[in-house]
């Protein structure tokens, strides 16, 4: 772990100059991105913690880092003695908001960069701070972490943007904009402001590479009843992008002019309301509930702005037939790359006795993926983990310090790729030797949970929250569980983690029912710290299913899995499976063999491994 004292000293000096006692440093950028560019990794810079989720709070005397169960082990290793780790979700552990508020008693000032915190989150934090005896939450428009970072802060990326043609996107830009305007008309809304990068990319059928692993670009958008404006650094756009936007009547303005334009539009609409008399009805501006406090303030705040779940995000989460066909196709190709990789890895470790470390394995997998049609890059850093490292849920192997893969231990590989026709995310846990009874039992309990969720049939209107227990039920019966969600939404050649849908216990998963066209992961797991970790993950699509009856005139839904990679035969405890589970597993194996064997003509090594791992489970 690196010493965080120098950067904390610089930050505290800046806090004192501004009479700030508590400074909040979220993980996200000004677009609420989960994955961020290096220039926006402020929480990592100040704390040394590299996980994708968490919040740092620095006072003049103390510092705390809050994160969720995926990152408890990682944070404990990366944080130095300056930091207190707040394990979110555990009993008697305060939330980061509660901890920040507790430091504000006596009228102390709590501050945050308003571009990094959603307006709703800022309001909640302000309420807690005031209740604890602090002053009103202060929006500091200058980010003092950036000042402390100084010249060593990386430059903001400015990568080229490309057009995603309709034959891959499945829906023209004009149609998407018109459907959004129809939603705005229902509320007499003068404008909707799009801040999430994947929503901008989806809305305009454009892709970029400003943020690693995510085909997005720094941008905002404004949609009014008359205009559509894309705010982006124009140097990113080539002639084809400009023509594409012109054809769809989209104006282009500089990225940095977004907030000034929002302030101007607020003033303009306010004037129209005042001049229009009783007959003029103009609703509030609409922004996403993830839009920044800075955006809300620019548009006039309470009384002028209505926060809501983004209608763009909702539309994006329901894939069209073109996108679903792309997801099917890219997962077959991706599965072929994984099958070839696992066969190669076993041959290296077991037959040839060659030492392979976690990073070398991840690099080999990326090389095999890169040969597949439409490959663009990875969708997240590959989690290549052996033995005890597999118990670190979001483990990140580092070159030079990672472990050598032990053929006698569990190996967990969670990986994915971006293809122009879809996004993949697959986890398989393997053992290249003789697994222990405990490992086999844990693996089979996890597999049973995956099958239970995959085969679920449920009425339309059911949420992911309601289905979560299907994946955990067999672990629960044994007093076991896992500290992460069961499923997240997946983008179509977009972010591998996509809202608003998911399967888990988060409150947000109670709000949005699953719908045909949703694409989600199914990834139960089990982890023993210091020993081993098990996770199995498939991607599946929500589809309508035919049932014998139709109670209440409701339609019923189920899942179609698209991941095509075998499970580890040596880790399956067959006596723990029911006849139905064995039948499902054998049907899945037949499906994998049928869809992928054509990739391995002349490749006896891979074909032998595939045949063995898809053999019937008796």
Curated annotation (Swiss-Prot):
Free-text comment on the cofactor: Binds 2 manganese ions per subunit.
Keywords: Aminopeptidase, Hydrolase, Manganese, Metal-binding, Metalloprotease, Protease
Reactions the enzyme catalyzes: Release of any N-terminal amino acid, including proline, that is linked to proline, even from a dipeptide or tripeptide
GO biological process entries: proteolysis
GO MF terms held by the record: metal ion binding; metalloaminopeptidase activity
Top-level enzyme category: hydrolase
Enzyme Commission number(s): 3.4.11.9
Superkingdom classification of source: Eukaryota
Amino-acid positions noted as binding Mn(2+) 2 in the UniProt annotation, renumbered to this chain: 414, 425, 537
Entry-linked PROSITE patterns: PROLINE_PEPTIDASE
UniProt binding sites for Mn(2+) 1: 425, 523, 537
Pfam families: Creatinase_N, Creatinase_N_2, Peptidase_M24, Peptidase_M24_C
Keyword Hydrolase: yes
Function description: Catalyzes the removal of a penultimate prolyl residue from the N-termini of peptides.
Stated name of the protein: Probable Xaa-Pro aminopeptidase P
Organism expressing this protein natively: Metarhizium acridum (strain CQMa 102)
Organism lineage string: Eukaryota, Fungi, Dikarya, Ascomycota, Pezizomycotina
Name of the gene encoding the protein in the UniProt record: AMPP
């Amino acid at each position: 772990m690196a010493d965080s004292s120098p950067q904390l000293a610089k930050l505290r000096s800046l806090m004192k100059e501004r009479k700030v006692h508590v400074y909040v440093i979220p993980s996200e950028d000004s677009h609420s991105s989960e994955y961020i560019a290096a220039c926006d990794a402020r929480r990592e810079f100040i704390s040394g913690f590299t996980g994708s989720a968490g919040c740092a709070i620095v006072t003049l005397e103390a510092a705390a880092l809050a994160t969720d169960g995926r990152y408890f082990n990682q944070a404990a290793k990366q944080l130095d003695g300056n930091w207190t780790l707040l394990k979110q979700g555990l009993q008697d552990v305060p939330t980061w908001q509660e901890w920040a508020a507790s430091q504000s008693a006596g009228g102390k000032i709590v501050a945050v960069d308003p571009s990094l915190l959603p307006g709703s989150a800022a309001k909640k934090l302000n309420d807690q701070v005031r209740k604890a005896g602090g002053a009103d939450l202060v929006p500091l428009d200058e980010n003092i972490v950036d000042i402390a970072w100084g010249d060593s802060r990386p430059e903001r990326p400015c990568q080229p943007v490309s057009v995603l043609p309709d034959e891959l996107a499945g829906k023209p830009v004009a149609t998407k904009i018109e459907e959004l305007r129809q939603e705005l008309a229902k509320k007499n809304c003068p404008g909707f402001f799009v801040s999430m990068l994947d929503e901008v990319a989806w809305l305009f059928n454009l892709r970029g590479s400003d943020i690693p692993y995510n085909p997005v670009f720094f941008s905002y958008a404004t949609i009014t009843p008359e205009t559509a404006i894309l705010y982006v650094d124009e140097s990113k756009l080539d002639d084809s992008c400009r023509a594409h936007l012109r054809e769809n009547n989209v104006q282009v303005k500089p990225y940095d002019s977004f907030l000034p334009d929002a302030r101007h539009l607020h003033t303009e609409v306010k004037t129209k309301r005042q001049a229009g008399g009783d007959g003029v009805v103009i609703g509030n501006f609409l922004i996403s509930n993830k839009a920044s406090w800075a955006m809300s303030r620019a548009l006039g705040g309470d009384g002028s702005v209505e926060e809501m779940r983004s209608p763009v995000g909702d539309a994006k989460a329901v894939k069209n037939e073109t996108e679903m066909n792309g997801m099917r196709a890219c997962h077959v190709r991706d599965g072929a790359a994984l099958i070839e990789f696992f066969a190669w890895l076993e041959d290296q470790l077991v037959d040839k006795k060659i030492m392979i470390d976690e990073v070398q394995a991840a690099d080999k997998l990326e090389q095999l993926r890169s040969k597949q049609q439409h490959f663009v890059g990875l969708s997240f850093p590959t989690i290549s983990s052996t033995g005890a490292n597999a118990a670190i849920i979001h483990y990140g192997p580092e070159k030079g310090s990672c472990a050598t893969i032990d053929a006698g231990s569990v190996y967990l590989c969670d990986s994915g790729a971006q293809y122009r026709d879809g996004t993949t995310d697959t986890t398989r846990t393997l053992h290249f030797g003789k697994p222990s009874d405990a490992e086999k039992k844990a693996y089979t309990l996890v597999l049973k949970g995956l099958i239970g969720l995959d085969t679920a049939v449920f009425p339309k209107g059911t949420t992911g929250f309601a289905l979560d227990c299907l994946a955990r039920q067999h672990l629960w019966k044994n007093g076991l569980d896992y500290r992460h969600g069961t499923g997240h939404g997946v983008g179509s050649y977009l972010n591998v983690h996509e809202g608003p849908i998911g399967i888990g216990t988060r409150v947000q998963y109670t709000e949005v029912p699953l719908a045909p066209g949703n694409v989600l992961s199914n990834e139960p797991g089990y982890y023993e710290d210091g020993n081993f970790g098990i996770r199995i993950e498939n991607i599946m699509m929500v589809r309508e299913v035919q049932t014998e009856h139709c109670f209440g005139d409701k339609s019923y839904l189920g899942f179609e899995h698209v991941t095509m990679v075998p499970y580890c035969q040596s880790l399956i405890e067959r006596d723990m499976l029911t006849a139905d589970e064995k039948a499902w597993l054998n049907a899945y194996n037949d499906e994998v063999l049928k869809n992928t064997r054509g990739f391995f003509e002349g490749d006896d090594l891979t074909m032998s491994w595939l045949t063995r791992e898809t053999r019937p489970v008796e």
